[in-house]
Amino acid sequence: MADQFRPETAQNLYKVLRHLGVEMHYPEQQTCCGLAAYNAGHWDEARLTGEKFINEFGSERYIVMPSAACANMVRNNYNRFFYNTSLHLEYKKLQSKVFELSDFLINVLHVSAWKGKFKAKVMLHVENSAIIDYHLKDEPFQLLKMIEGIILVGPQQHNSDCGFGGVFSVMYSQLSTEIALDELNLAVTEGAEYIIATETSCVLQLESVAIKNGINIKIMTLTDLLAESLRFSDAIFSEENQVAIG
């Protein structure tokens, strides 16, 4: 999704990791993790996409994604396709290398300070699936609190649904819009200037509904915010931190 609709998010993921001295590899033939097909019930297509993913990324590097939904797809849902198959060993090796960005920064790189500034009132939107399925904890909040100038508003342990859900937003468009409006109205009520989302899909969903309903608020991903906040870095490269971007 980032590649097709938000290429700047993929570029910003690169900037964030390079700022921390991480050497990166970008498999140019990569396509998708297969989540959209999986959620739509097209499991054969999702399995073929998964095979391509495993063959292209391998298991030698960390694989860092700006999306907990995609990371969960690879970490957990691929098990339905590749358990006890010819790709079983390759998948198991890769499984432990897959991380959502904030999880990677906090729990692998152990980032405890961020050299960036961004003056704004922001509300963080963490998808339910990121917490329930991927088991993301407070890593996004930890990162936001490191950025000078950020004022966090809204519930500090807030996790919700943006109403996207892949085909859900098409099949149940009215309900999807109402869910997004609830989140947008909460942010406006709390005085937020920005909604910071952990999923690119939620940025697209919330932006679309905000524009259609004349709601004046900016929406961006956590990845984009981290990159936007950067000013200077004296990070030193470590050969232990080699990743592939997915």
Please state what every model-predicted region is.
Residues 1-246:
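Iron-sulfur cluster-binding electron-transfer modules in prokaryotic oxidoreductases
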